């Protein structure tokens, strides 16, 4: 060892722009950032949760209480905070709902862990205890789940309605939940349920009550020629991922025309090719054609002459939905088309929807692709309605896949909190403290539901625990009346996987953050802050060691 090292002189291995925060400072910094994210969405939880107005740099406004939308729209730079954002995204991808619950759980687990760290409990010990508690929690939920079948339509509609609660769809919740269940059951097949086959068309104008389900596909296009029929009944449909145009040569060539007759010959030949294309469609019996690319003007003329309704530049996703709905096949080249490739619909026609012309492909037998038309008075209303419907579609799909649900209203969390406290007694070592902290953290959900409903959280928790001590697993908090009621009887239920995924994701995120004891930044992670003495940066600002805050979240932790 060199003399310099023996004298305690540190060896500099990082660049001068690099920043490093280690030990308790790093843990505290990351925990603070994670808690700030959870705090930002906490007031949106439950049927009486508040909305957030998010304004981006371009002045675009989003009004929502959907957890994952809020976090996606916020300008979050802090790496630990982004881990919590990923929790909400995972929850959304896996089950479609419960994003706010997952994030709040993660934030509270970090808060409880901070107290244990202050009491000299090692982060690894906390991580082990949290994982044991999470496994036990999932086991308890599995044991108490309620079985649901595809035939239990009443329960399915209640699940759909629960997912919409507090998301701007209250006035038409009964109608919308019926539409959602109809849509999911319509696209269900032997391979499972792909909610991407439920297309959502937003229409500004009318009321939410005017929303409807079309068993078929709506294409946001018009006929290419006004001389084409406005509607076709009992239509054979060609779906072409190609152009009805004369193909250009791949090699640039120059042709010298010395005689006007030669030019006319070129034009005649081009017209002949286009007519042959249309003749191919007529020959296979097509009454309507949807094309993914362009349609030449001359081809449009011949199509109209043959009474074929044509649509050009349809989106690839629309072509796939058309094929699924009508039983047709997307053909990549017109030369390959055969009669067996055509789909069938009882009606193909152009209709006015909210002032815009769209093509409706309806009356499809056993349609495996459907369209929900959502109406509302303003753009903000239909946007939030779309988010509510997407959540609802996700939970109905998850319920049909798993066949198990749980009561809502904070009932599962209250039961888990009690059972995990008992379980902690059987856990040896300091992990017992972590299991108890996990149980304490789960109380955040019923407590937040009570706070957001303007109720006393302590009184509500006491009532809930008392009922659960008496063996009432389904006892949950009614945010409208403030009473503790049987949520299963009330029809407030949600998929089992929403809760298990929320616990799993929150636990993994919290454990990952707790195990970080060193943050090394290769450059300036100031998060866009100026670094001036006057800039407070808000709750999640300082990252210790000169590291930055959470960008657009500076000061938002306390504001929300």
From Swiss-Prot:
Single GO MF descriptor: ATP binding
Name the UniProt record assigns to this protein: Thermosome subunit 1
Compositionally biased tracts (Gly residues): 538-550
Physiological role: Molecular chaperone that assists in the folding or refolding of nascent or denatured proteins along with ATP hydrolysis. ATPase activity is highest in thermosome assemblies containing CCT1:CCT2, followed by assemblies containing CCT1:CCT2:CCT3. Required for thermosome ATPase activity. Not required for growth.
Alphabetical list of SUPFAM superfamilies matching this protein: GroEL apical domain-like (SSF52029), GroEL equatorial domain-like (SSF48592), GroEL-intermediate domain like (SSF54849)
Region named Disordered: 525-550
Name of encoding gene: cct1
Domain of life where this protein originates: Archaea
Additional record remark: Can substitute for loss of cct2 or cct3. One of either cct1 or cct2 is required for growth.
Disulfide bonds: none
InterPro entries cross-referenced by the UniProt entry: Chaperone_TCP-1, Chaperonin_TCP-1_CS, Cpn60/GroEL/TCP-1, GroEL-like_apical_dom_sf, GROEL-like_equatorial_sf, TCP-1-like_intermed_sf, TCP-1_chaperonin, thermosome_alpha
């Amino acid at each position: 060892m060199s003399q310099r090292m023996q004298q305690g002189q540190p060896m500099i291995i990082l660049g001068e722009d690099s920043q490093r925060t280690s030990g308790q400072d790093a843990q505290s910094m990351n925990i603070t950032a994670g808690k700030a994210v959870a705090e930002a969405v906490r007031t949106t939880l439950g049927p009486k949760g508040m909305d957030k107005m998010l304004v981006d740099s371009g002045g675009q406004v989003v009004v929502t209480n959907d957890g994952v939308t809020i976090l996606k729209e916020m300008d979050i730079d802090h790496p630990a905070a982004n881990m919590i954002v990923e929790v909400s995204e995972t929850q959304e991808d896996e089950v479609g709902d419960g994003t706010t619950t997952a994030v709040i759980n993660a934030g509270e687990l970090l808060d409880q862990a901070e107290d244990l760290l202050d009491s000299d409990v090692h982060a690894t010990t906390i991580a082990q205890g949290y994982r044991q508690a999470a496994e036990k929690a999932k086991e308890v939920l599995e044991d108490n789940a309620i079985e649901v079948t595809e035939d239990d339509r009443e329960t399915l509609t209640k699940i759909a309605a629960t997912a919409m609660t507090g998301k701007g769809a209250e006035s038409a919740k009964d109608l919308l939940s019926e539409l959602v269940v109809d849509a999911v059951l319509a696209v269900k097949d032997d391979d499972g349920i792909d909610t991407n086959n439920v297309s959502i068309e937003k229409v500004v104008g009318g009321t939410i009550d005017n929303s409807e389900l079309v068993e078929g596909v709506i294409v946001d296009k018009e006929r290419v020629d006004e001389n084409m029929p406005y509607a076709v009944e009992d239509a054979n449909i060609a779906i072409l991922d190609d152009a009805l145009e004369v193909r250009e040569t791949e090699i640039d060539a120059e042709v010298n025309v010395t005689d006007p007759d030669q030019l006319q010959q070129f034009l005649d030949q081009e017209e002949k090719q286009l007519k042959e294309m249309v003749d191919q469609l007529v020959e296979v019996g097509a009454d309507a054609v949807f094309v993914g690319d362009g349609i030449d003007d001359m081809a449009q003329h011949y199509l109209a002459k043959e009474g074929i309704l044509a649509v050009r530049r349809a989106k690839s996703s629309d072509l796939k939905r058309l094929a699924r709905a009508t039983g047709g096949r997307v053909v990549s080249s017109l030369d390959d088309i055969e009669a067996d490739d055509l789909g069938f619909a009882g009606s193909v026609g152009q209709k006015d929807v909210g002032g815009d012309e769209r093509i409706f492909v309806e009356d499809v037998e056993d349609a495996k692709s459907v369209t929900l038309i959502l109406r509302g008075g303003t753009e903000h209303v239909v946007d939030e309605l779309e988010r509510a419907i997407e959540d609802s579609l996700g939970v109905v799909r998850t319920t049909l896949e798993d066949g198990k649900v749980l009561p809502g209203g904070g009932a599962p969390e209250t039961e888990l909190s009690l059972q995990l406290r008992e379980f902690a007694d059987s856990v040896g070592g300091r992990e017992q403290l972590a299991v108890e902290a996990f149980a304490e953290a789960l109380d955040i959900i019923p407590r937040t539901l009570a706070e957001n409903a303007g109720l006393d959280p302590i009184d509500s928790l006491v009532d809930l625990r008392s009922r659960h001590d008496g063996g009432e697993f389904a006892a949950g908090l009614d945010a409208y009346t403030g009473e503790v009621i049987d949520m299963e009887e009330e029809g407030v239920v949600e998929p089992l996987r929403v809760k298990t995924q929320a616990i799993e994701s929150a636990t993994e995120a919290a454990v990952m953050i707790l195990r970080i004891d060193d943050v090394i930044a290769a450059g300036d992670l100031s998060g866009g802050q100026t670094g001036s003495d006057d800039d407070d940066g808000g709750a999640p600002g300082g990252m210790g060691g000169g590291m930055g805050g959470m960008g657009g979240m500076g000061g938002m932790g306390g504001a929300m």
